[in-house]
UniProtKB/Swiss-Prot annotation:
This is Diaminopimelate epimerase. Keywords: Amino-acid biosynthesis, Cytoplasm, Isomerase, Lysine biosynthesis. Catalyzes the stereoinversion of LL-2,6-diaminopimelate (L,L-DAP) to meso-diaminopimelate (meso-DAP), a precursor of L-lysine and an essential component of the bacterial peptidoglycan. It is an enzyme of class 5 (isomerase). The record marks 160, 209 as: Could be important to modulate the pK values of the two catalytic cysteine residues. GO terms for molecular function: diaminopimelate epimerase activity. Homodimer. It comes from Shewanella frigidimarina (strain NCIMB 400). Belongs to the diaminopimelate epimerase family. The active site is at 74 (proton donor), 218 (proton acceptor). PROSITE patterns: DAP_EPIMERASE.
Amino acid sequence: MIHFTKMHGLGNDFMVVDGVTQNVFFSPEQIRRLADRNFGIGFDQLLLVEPPYDPDLDFHYRIFNADGSEVEQCGNGARCFARFVRNKGLTQKNKIRVSTNSGKITLRIERDGNVTVNMGVPVIEPSQIPFKAKKSEKTYLLQTPMQTYLCGAISMGNPHCVIQVEDVQTVNVDEIGSSLTRHERFPKGVNVGFMQVINPGHIKLRVYERGAAETLACGTGACAAAAVGQLQDKLDKQVRVDLPGGSLIINWEGEGKPLWMTGPAEHVYDGQIQL
């Protein structure tokens, strides 16, 4: 039997598994079955806690999408990861350092129960996103057979395309997101964010996630939108990001500096399942 915990960050929901005290392995087929909301547990991503590969770190953090693919980063998941390892007694620290498949991040559990995550330095160099472009720009033209989009491209450990829209409520997220998530200029696919600027300190955002379609919240998407908006001189250093599932606070001092995300992480229930 595998013991697991169901958690969510702003409605972005996770199956979290302790791979430190349990010997676990999940095949892509098993993950797809577990992710099914009718026949399985149901989740956007599976989060796996592993022992650290680096003695200076506390844990290794792995993320699997509902389609079974492993991805580099998940911001909402990172907050749940921090609460999970504390709740399960895997650490007593309030400041937790973990490695991911894209680098190292620091998680800080706040007194009010929210979690602040040092998401690292946003990557704007196209080849490192990865994104096919001759040079780094604040805005790119992205062509599809149906339409041309103005977008920002950035990586928060995973690739993001951010498009500014007049009204996030009326945009066809599924249609546009599905057409862009596999765009040829993003060799590893891309998460597509639709950003409505309310004022320089406040945006609304919907995100079509690579491998998961639209979710109620995307932490890295919120970070990407705030960073792109700041690079385009549209947003302040601190931005409130309203997602369908709730709000996040993003702080960024600018290019070359780490970006910080603060938001909730909620425990739903503990369970066990036979694979």
